């Protein structure tokens, strides 16, 4: 089918972007202008044959995430937990499924309080989406060290602290998000400006602290790298036993676990048993064909929703 108008062209771009058929920069360029340096980074990434972590990779990944959550068709796949189109998120790391899953599971009620532990949502496009849906929402970002990105003018609060000892009263937040963070708790966090530890059970301490500050009927959304258990010193890859421990320790009134796996056809839904033997990829390559079958980082993720 041929769409003659610019409106139709933009409307159908997100789907083709997700399948890797259109450069990611085009979609947002048509929506609004980009700086020349930003565009140059995107062009550099695509000229590199989409090699992960090459110049422009981060920018291209964020563009991809934005186009996914802006696409009614693609976003509905996360809302309704249905299969993604073949090729979705190829050559990108697990963030391309974690962010849409988080946004699909947030409650956009008025006057709610949201705590982001990490904080992975500290991007303008994330905050714009949260505040456009709920302008009265109170958003608090928790991190170990200061983040260069600061949106205090959008009424976003920033708190420095350890998730194992949160500086908040009991039953305060309606929602808490924790995107690929809990696996770092109690580990070597020197790269994040913190200390060297090796306390493998402290993710449970963090979990119970988040439960403490969460209101009754509130939701805790957690994502972790998933597969066979691995200890890399600065983080752990969770296996099924550890995921089950999270649920058992939290004692939720309701819970759900969604798994996504990376294959030569990109990211898609998967059952836990088909992810259980996956290893985390720590290798880097300048050969784009390496990433057709090998994940960029995590080969699978567990997305856990816990209702207090």
Predicted segments with their positions:
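Membrane-proximal basic amphipathic "stem/tether" segments
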Residues: 1-83, 275-283, 297-303
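A C-terminal cap/extension of S-adenosyl-L-methionine-dependent methyltransferases
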Residues: 25, 35, 158, 244-248, ...
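Conserved alpha-helix/loop element of class I SAM-dependent methyltransferases that forms part
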Residues: 93-112, 123-129
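Class I SAM-dependent methyltransferase SAM/SAH-binding core
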Residues: 113-165
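A short acidic, Gly/Pro-enriched loop at the edge of an enzyme's catalytic core
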Residues: 164-177
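A short SAM/SAH-binding and catalytic strip from SAM-dependent methyltransferases
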Residues: 174-200
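A short glycine-rich, Lys/Arg-flanked "PGG" loop and its adjoining helix->strand segment in the class I
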Residues: 194-219
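Conserved class I S-adenosyl-L-methionine
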Residues: 219-246
């Amino acid at each position: 089918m041929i769409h003659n108008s610019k409106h139709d062209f933009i409307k159908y771009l997100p789907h083709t972007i997700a399948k890797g058929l259109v450069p990611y920069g085009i979609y947002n360029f048509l929506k609004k202008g980009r700086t020349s340096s930003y565009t140059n980074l995107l062009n550099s990434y695509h000229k590199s044959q989409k090699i992960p972590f090459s110049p422009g990779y981060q920018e291209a990944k964020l563009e991809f995430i934005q186009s996914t959550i802006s696409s009614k068709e693609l976003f509905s796949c996360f809302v309704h937990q249905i299969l993604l189109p073949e090729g979705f998120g190829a050559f990108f790391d697990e963030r391309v499924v974690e962010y849409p899953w988080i946004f699909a599971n947030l409650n956009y009620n008025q006057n709610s309080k949201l705590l982001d532990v990490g904080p992975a949502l500290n991007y303008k496009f994330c905050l714009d989406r949260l505040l456009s849906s709920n302008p009265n929402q109170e958003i608090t970002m928790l991190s170990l060290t200061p983040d260069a990105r600061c949106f205090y003018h959008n009424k976003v609060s920033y708190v420095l602290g350890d998730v194992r000892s949160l500086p908040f009263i009991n039953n305060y937040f309606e929602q808490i998000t924790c995107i690929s963070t809990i696996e770092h708790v109690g580990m070597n966090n020197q790269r994040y400006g913190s200390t060297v530890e090796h306390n493998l059970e402290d993710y449970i301490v963090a979990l119970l602290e988040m439960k403490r500050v969460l209101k009754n009927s509130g939701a805790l959304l957690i994502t972790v790298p998933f597969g066979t258990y691995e200890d890399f010193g600065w983080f752990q890859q969770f296996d099924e036993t550890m995921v089950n421990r999270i649920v058992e320790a939290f004692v939720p009134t309701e819970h759900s676990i969604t798994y996504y796996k990376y294959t030569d056809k990109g990211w898609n839904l998967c059952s836990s048993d088909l992810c259980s033997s996956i290893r985390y990829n720590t290798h880097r390559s300048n050969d784009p064909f390496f990433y057709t079958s090998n994940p960029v980082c995590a080969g699978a993720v567990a997305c856990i929703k816990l209702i207090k």
